[in-house]
Amino acid sequence: MERIKELRNLMSQSRTREILTKTTVDHMAIIKKYTSGRQEKNPSLRMKWMMAMKYPITADKRITEMIPERNEQGQTLWSKMSDAGSDRVMVSPLAVTWWNRNGPMTSTVHYPKIYKTYFEKVERLKHGTFGPVHFRNQVKIRRRVDINPGHADLSAKEAQDVIMEVVFPNEVGARILTSESQLTITKEKKEELQDCKISPLMVAYMLERELVRKTRFLPVAGGTSSVYIEVLHLTQGTCWEQMYTPGGEVRNDDVDQSLIIAARNIVRRAAVSADPLASLLEMCHSTQIGGTRMVDILRQNPTEEQAVDICKAAMGLRISSSFSFGGFTFKRTSGSSVKREEEVLTGNLQTLKIRVHEGYEEFTMVGKRATAILRKATRRLIQLIVSGRDEQSIAEAIIVAMVFSQEDCMIKAVRGDLNFVNRANQRLNPMHQLLRHFQKDAKVLFQNWGIEHIDNVMGMIGVLPDMTPSTEMSMRGLRVSKMGVDEYSRAERVVVSIDRFLRVRDQRGNVLLSPEEVSETQGTEKLTITYSSSMMWEINGPESVLVNTYQWIIRNWETVKIQWSQNPTMLYNKMEFEPFQSLVPKAIRGQYSGFVRTLFQQMRDVLGTFDTTQIIKLLPFAAAPPKQSRMQFSSLTVNVRGSGMRILVRGNSPVFNYNKTTKRLTILGKDAGTLTEDPDEGTSGVESAVLRGFLILGKEDRRYGPALSINELSNLAKGEKANVLIGQGDVVLVMKRKRDSSILTDSQTATKRIRMAIN
């Protein structure tokens, strides 16, 4: 109040008022500030001042022939004076209005195509809904976000080549369009832009917006997909937020979202297979997202998420050098440590072997709903400053930091045994054991941590063991802050290595990622994900496994048939039969397998007992490690639809139904495909027709190599002999005829000869 009185006093003296209002601004520093350099120091003032002049715009001289001197109201549109320092004329803002109303019209057909991203943005805003404005403290953290909705994911170089090819097709310069997306886009754009009158430079700018992902490091509280970022200025201020639902989705956001879901599913599935790394690669290479190969998306898409990064590491791509623990991304901002194995005792006297980080380090921790700054020494948390959306999120961050600190009081807070396992039923490593334990219940941990008196610091507050805020006391070293912690902006990518259990390490051997870090969150993908790999059959449940297994056998029947008779063990070990095993009751798997393998061996030994339908039906059961027993089965059980269902060894059942007349196979009422050869007529039709031009010499002769399928016969030279597998699973020796004249009689004699050769 005193100060205000003083000021009022001063202003009442006329001399003060005069000095403040009349003094000229001739101070050197001020003049320097506003006149040095080309950069405009006060653009808005400059603009207002310019527009207050009569002719603030300059235009090409030709404009005087295209625009009248005065408009309908008699106002002058351009000055006869030339612009100083150029041969342009001075023009009034009214001239622009005249031009917009009365100037020449041009074809507008190309505008929506060129300015596609703008037109789409208008549509999204038109159909978007803005909700109420809420006033509350905004915890914003800077994140790297995509600011450009509706783009393809080309690299800058790829996009440059496409733009040059589209806009300046005749310019010299090496342009190699290699990727599928480059070629598709180029073709599409060339067609769209025929006879386009818009300036090539503008077209190039707009194409760049459409082809390349542009990211900025912006303060965000809330949605980070590009359709939210484009309205960031409308949805969140320093102390307010406005609810908003976008009026449309864009493919780039959908790709990011679907990629994360596919990667999570694949990592989770690979982790439980016999060779996780090989399985992961096989699945990444055989999966498509929205019709694009997943490996192509991984190469181009900068999304950083644990599962996505594991897939990238497996493909030999560089990933971010930060590491993940408990769902938080840790980035070391200063300090260093060495690692040493140490044995520690839990509160339950269980011994744990942990890798202790010795040394002082500082980290930023960034999670989905909370962020923190952590300072720690060897097995000691010095300080943790957390901010988060709510109490729950803050607690999550605190637990992760306490476990990460490896403090003794945390390890002593363990009650009961630690025996958490991963999806493959392997014990988790000690750090994840501790994490899981306290994520389930952190009460003892918080109670045992210790409490301290705190100083009053602006924007900081203490937190008690029951997670209530306090200004006097806090758990030792812990503070809650109103301000968020920014994500690490330097997006440096490093070379990493990955072991067969999908643990990703940097070049110093620090573990950055492991399957334990992959989120269990399930979501529904926006784009169709097509997993061609048999390992992903089970993602849609047991029925899908059943249908897919039989479809696979039918599709590959030609090769399966040969392997069945020549090299059954190799066939039984095929990974396509792996998912099926989860449907067969564990206790009886071995017996079923032994029974089916014996049955198949009898079929191979006793000529003429080959039965296609039965082989297809029972084959998946033979894949389990067999147990020798004298047990016979008339039906085999599979667990689908929540209960055991029976597949009859001889004959049809609701699970496996083969229709002889239509040759269609239905599994649980679902169509599983058509068998191309008839299991019953075998010799009479197909073979006699196909064996025209071949002479049947007799029984199989091993000297002529493994049996060929009928399709492979066409490769034989005239006079060449080979073993061939015919419909009933029998193998006969044939020779390709030297003359074509006798082909007609072959089909009649073939049938007789086959019977003789067999019997």
Curated annotation (Swiss-Prot):
The record marks K627 as: Mammalian adaptation. One of its GO terms (molecular function) is RNA-directed RNA polymerase activity. The keyword Cytoplasm does not apply. SUPFAM superfamilies: PB2 C-terminal domain-like. Keywords: Cap snatching, Eukaryotic host gene expression shutoff by virus, Eukaryotic host transcription shutoff by virus, Host gene expression shutoff by virus, Host mitochondrion, Host nucleus, Host-virus interaction, Inhibition of host innate immune response by virus, Inhibition of host MAVS by virus, Inhibition of host RLR pathway by virus, Inhibition of host RNA polymerase II by virus, mRNA capping, mRNA processing, Viral immunoevasion, Viral transcription, Virion. It holds the Pfam family Flu_PB2_3rd. Coiled coil: none annotated. HAMAP family: INV_PB2. This is Polymerase basic protein 2.
